Amino acid sequence: MTTQELYNAIICKPDLHSRPTLHDDILIWHLYQNAYVQAFCHDGDTTIDIVSNSLFSGSVMHWHPNEEDMVDELYNLGKAGNMLVLKKSLLGTGIFYIGPVQNFPLADRTPLHFGKKKWDGGQLVYFEQK
């Protein structure tokens, strides 16, 4: 799968929050207030990257899903009403939750864009769609 094929598959999905763009073989999707998603796919090499566009810009986290999972992973990030929650700790950063805002398991979360809250020995970082 190429990034162009990934882009074509994503834009056909229903209920997208917004439409991603394709620039120099990189899919760019501005979903969040202070961060955006970059995705790349070529001959089995896949990357999804959450990039901060705040003062200290750079990659917040990236992962390498299987090629057959790329469309579903991106769709979960970009489906209208979904949010991403990352858990940061001394050991690294990982995905804590991707899904509908109303189904997020911690009811006492701080509803901030790119908000942070201490939780269980780490820090949760919230990305809600703008």
Which residue ranges define each predicted feature?
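Acidic, proline/glycine-rich low-complexity IDRs
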Residues: 9-10, 72-130
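Short linear motifs in intrinsically disordered
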Residues: 17-20, 36-40, 82-90
